[in-house]
A protein has these predicted regions:
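Rossmann-fold cofactor-recognition segment
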Residues: 106-120
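C-terminal catalytic/substrate-binding lobe primarily of soluble NAD(P)-dependent oxidoreductases
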Residues: 212-456
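Rossmann-fold NAD(P)-binding glycine/threonine-rich loop
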Residues: 163-190
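Conserved Rossmann-fold cofactor-binding substructure of NAD(P)-dependent oxidoreductases
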Residues: 118-131
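N-terminal Rossmann-like NAD(P) cofactor-binding module of classical short-chain dehydrogenase/reductase
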Residues: 128, 134-138, 160
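Conserved N-terminal Rossmann-fold NAD(P)-binding element of oxidoreductases
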Residues: 63-70
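Helix N-cap at the beta1-alpha1 junction of Rossmann-like dinucleotide-binding domains, i.e.
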Residues: 95-97
Length: 456
């Protein structure tokens, strides 16, 4: 592993080799002329209090996770299951008691907890200074992405998230706000990994893997997301209700022939067959990974995203829309300003508590058409995840699991040096192979279908 970061002068007295090798920016200590006391080369990177042993890649894997919902529950528990890499974990949230409950379930590794307001950059920086992480994993709200990225730059620590930035007062999300940080992260020698959940995240890695191994040109991409589970609630969302409802009530959007096309929300739909599930009505939506994938794979002629919804879910959603409960505009109630969708979130079931009675499975994948050696080829790569198995392993339902596990894998890729590059990057811009290998190891095995009917 090598470093590309530039660190301010700081010296670690002790085991420093006498040779004058280039350290990639990590400073050699004042005892550089002393005989080496070890065959290993040890350098100290002061911004994170990070000791790096070059030869055997033995390092302090200090991770700070922001957010304490269902995804964080999975990510932190999976980090603890990989304690050889994640040697020191802190979980921080606005409500420390939520962090404490997650930490109490983990027996083999100490997980420290802290209270932090992710909207307060100075507060974040003080927490970073106290814990000195190597990587900050942002599993908080998308509204807080830029605050956390700013704090990472102020302190000097790398960054990973699972969802792109969305303004609090506008139901609109796109990568442009975060891509604008690319030069700042590069100049600071820091890595920012964007969208490392399942979709976005694994879907980008699936696409990169297909492009690397199975296609010379990608022509069409359809990302298909099916939740064939039953949580036995009249109405509930599988992740943060506010974010979920804002997402699915936006206009649909897809890419074709070099242009973006809009559709009315959930107006385009068709039945698609999902492995081990069967046919499910699937609705065309806009999803953030489309923006980066058409940019990084310019041979794509069309890219779309589809998600399944049951009729009961859609009926409840229409009623809530019709009575104004999904609005993001503040209203006055008894002299107090409230946002209807935030109130709705408060009364809906907590997604983190759905797992116990959840049955069924998810099925998410990429259906791709393109050319290989001059011949047209179709390819479908997907994962199915059991809600019951996810709950038995982590205490969370399958949607949280399919997001939290990739976040952990992305952090692991960073700590191991496989996904470490100054700048701001989407996951498909890294080598997909080690990530794909980890999916099979960490509980999200994937499957491939060559030459099948893509239905799209």
């Amino acid at each position: 592993m090598s470093f590309t970061r530039n660190f301010a002068p700081y010296y670690l007295a002790g085991l420093i080799p006498s040779r004058k090798e280039e350290t990639g920016g990590c400073d050699r200590g004042p005892n550089a002329d002393r005989p080496a006391a070890s065959l290993e080369m040890v350098y100290f990177c002061p911004i994170q209090n990070h000791t790096q042993t070059i030869n055997n890649i033995d390092f302090m894997g200090k991770i700070l996770v922001v957010g304490a919902g269902g995804v964080s529950t999975v990510a932190v528990k999976k980090m603890a299951m990989n304690a050889d890499v994640f040697t020191d974990i802190m979980l921080a949230s606005r409500t420390k008691s939520k962090c404490d409950r997650i930490a109490e379930d983990i027996k083999n590794v100490r997980v420290r907890t802290a209270e932090v307001d992710a909207d307060n950059e100075d507060e974040l920086v003080r927490l970073f200074e106290d814990f000195r992480p190597e990587l900050v994993v942002n599993l908080a709200l998308p509204y807080q992405d830029l605050h956390i990225m700013n704090a990472c730059l102020k302190y000097g620590v790398s960054y990973l998230d699972t969802a792109n930035y969305e303004p609090l007062d506008e139901a609109k999300y796109e990568y442009s706000w975060q891509w604008a940080y690319k030069d700042r992260f590069r100049e600071a020698g820091l890595t920012a990994i964007l969208g490392c959940g399942f979709d976005p995240g694994v879907t980008g890695v699936f696409t990169a893997y297909a492009a690397k191994h199975h296609f010379d040109e990608l022509h069409t991409l359809d990302i298909v997301d099916c939740n064939a589970g039953d949580h036995h609630k009249a109405f509930a969302t599988n992740f943060n209700p506010e974010i979920n409802i804002r997402e699915i009530t936006q206009k649909g959007r897809y890419y074709e022939d070099g242009k973006w096309h809009e559709t009315e929300p959930l107006s385009v739909h068709q039945a698609l067959n999902y492995p081990n599930v069967g046919p499910r009505e699937s609705y065309l939506m806009y999803h953030e990974e489309l923006e980066s994938l058409v940019k990084n794979y310019p041979t794509l002629r069309r890219a779309r995203f589809w998600m399944t919804f049951g009729q009961e879910y859609l009926t409840h959603l229409r009623v809530m829309q019709n009575i104004g409960m999904t609005s993001i505009k503040p209203i006055l109630y008894k002299g107090v300003e409230i946002v209807p969708i935030q109130f709705l979130k408060a009364v809906l079931p907590d997604p983190g508590e759905l797992g116990e009675n959840y049955t069924g499975e998810t099925s998410i994948g990429c259906r791709i058409r393109g050319l290989k050696d001059g011949c047209e080829q179709t390819y479908y790569v997907y994962n199915n995840c059991s809600h019951r198995a996810a709950y038995e392993e982590t205490g969370a339902q399958g949607v949280s699991y399919t997001t939290g596990v990739p976040a952990m894998i992305g952090a692991k890729m960073f700590l191991e040096g496989q996904w470490r590059r100054p700048g701001v990057w989407n996951v498909e811009e890294f080598d997909p192979d080690p990530f794909m290998k980890e999916l099979n190891v960490q509980g999200l095995p994937w499957h491939e279908i060559f030459g099948g009917d893509l239905e799209l």
